Swiss-Prot record:
Gene3D superfamilies: 1.20.58.480. Pfam families: IDO. Transmembrane segments: none annotated. Heme binds at residue 347. Its EC number is 1.13.11.52. Monomer. This is Indoleamine 2,3-dioxygenase qulI. GO terms for biological process: 'de novo' NAD biosynthetic process from L-tryptophan; L-tryptophan catabolic process to kynurenine.
Length: 440
């Protein structure tokens, strides 16, 4: 391949327009009536959860074959439906259920094997393959209002808002992928103006993502997320404190030898977004954070392969470091790094609002929920993870070597970072204050 920008993105299930989102809208329902059992249950999932009848329905469900799934879109739809049903089964009772029904576990494992993704609730199940463009809006679809969810646990617009925020972020970021590929070529050709143009586009893209993320509070309350939605997004990993020391038991069909095995997977997490990891790879930030690397295992296989390819060819940071200390492109790179740090600060504020603060409050039934304080849906220590990712991002700045201060303006709506000029030292101090206030 002469030019990296000529890479066939479709071979990695990517689009030059929608990025990691499907180029064609995901299915709202499997077309074959054979799968009506699954689809009817998923459509009625909020009612079944609310009436505590999901367990009985799933335990009496017949085992359906995956042989009639006819296209990539159908396999993805099956994965979404089975993931929602499995998560609903595990977490809808007073205590988590440790054994999945075989009618869910067996096809979920087969579908996941086909799609090369983990057989559990993931970012792909909740967002990438679950959310579709709203018929009310035309192109381009880059705002939360432009999308709707096909499956939910609660039937609430608040839950849908949580998913469509993430999808709007993916939609905005997807258009950056061709520019990243061209920037790699630009470095090889020593075309500094093209690198400069890419960094400007990168900054604009991250600005747009921050504005979307900062809208989470418009239609999602703390209480709803923490007490009603968050439990369904959890995994079985690191969950001994709630009665899952070994994770979840996935039974096998007799044709597979019978019995089964205990599997402990992380819950769905935005750390499973390939887009954000691609941004890190592109700028050369956060390359040694173990949790981020682990989360690649929960991405669709083709997306994971694309990130591995990009890791092997990423060349922007070495090129920037080769430029003179007075290079305006070097300063622009630092500006891009600080934008990415600003995004992580915005994420910190969202986590504080929806996990850390309500964790110390009484839930609607009057019981305090302290056993998971400080843990994200992925099962990790959220504060440790956020510290590590932000510090890794900031450490990529080059400004120390040129003896001057990088001054930067952040999007006005990102309250954590402020709207005025801010240098790297100030950003670190502000971030530390935010973390200390949250932990207190």
């Amino acid at each position: 391949m002469k030019h990296f920008r000529d890479l066939d993105l479709s071979s990695y299930s990517l689009s030059s327009v929608s990025g990691f989102l499907p180029e064609r809208p995901a299915l709202e329902r499997l077309p074959n009536p054979y799968y009506d059992h699954w689809e009817d249950l998923s459509r009625n999932l909020p009612q079944l959860v609310a009436s505590d009848t999901l367990k009985d329905k799933l335990e009496r469900l017949p085992i359906l074959s995956t042989a009639l799934l006819d296209s990539e879109e159908e396999w993805r739809r099956a994965y979404v439906v089975l993931s929602f049903l499995s998560q609903g089964y595990i977490w809808s009772g007073d205590q988590p259920r440790r054994n999945l029904p075989i009618a869910i576990a067996a096809p979920l494992r087969r579908v996941s094997e086909y799609l090369t993704i983990m057989p559990c609730g993931t970012f792909a199940a909740y967002c990438l393959w679950n959310v579709i463009p709203s018929p009310k809006f035309g192109n381009p679809q880059i705002n939360p209002e432009d999308f709707i969810s096909t499956c939910t646990f609660t039937g609430s617009k608040e839950e849908e808002w949580f998913y469509v925020i993430s999808v709007a972020i993916e939609a905005r970021g997807g258009r950056l992928i061709p520019k990243i590929l061209d920037a790699i070529d630009a470095v090889k050709e020593n075309d500094t103006p093209r690198v400069r143009s890419f960094l400007e586009a990168f900054i604009t893209c991250v600005d747009g993502i921050i504005l979307v993320l900062d809208r989470m509070g418009e239609n999602l309350s703390q209480e709803f997320f923490y007490h009603r939605l968050r439990p369904y997004l959890r995994g079985g990993k690191n969950m001994a404190q709630v009665g899952l020391p070994d994770g979840i038991f996935y039974p096998l069909c007799q044709c597979e030898g019978g019995e089964g095995e205990w599997l402990a997977y992380s819950g769905g997490s935005n750390a499973q977004s390939s887009l954000i990891q691609l941004m890190d790879i592109t700028l050369g930030t956060c390359q040694n954070v173990e949790f981020i690397k682990e989360m690649r295992n929960y991405m669709p296989g083709p997306h994971r392969e694309f990130l591995e390819l990009m890791t092997s060819v990423s060349n922007i940071r070495p090129y920037i470091l080769s430029l003179g200390n007075d290079s305006d492109v070097r300063s622009l790179y630092d500006k891009a790094v600080l934008r990415l740090a600003a995004l992580r600060d915005c994420h910190l504020r969202v986590v504080a609002r929806y996990i850390l603060i309500p964790a110390g409050k009484k839930n609607p039934s009057g019981h305090r929920q302290l056993q998971e304080r400080g843990r994200g849906t992925g099962g990790t220590d959220i504060m440790k993870f956020l510290r590590e990712t932000r510090n890794n991002t900031l450490s990529a700045c080059c400004e120390q070597s040129k003896g001057s201060t990088v001054v930067q303006t952040y999007p006005k709506r990102c309250e954590t970072c402020g709207s005025g000029p801010i240098d790297r030292t100030t950003l670190i101090k502000k971030a530390t204050v935010v973390i200390n206030e949250i932990e207190c």
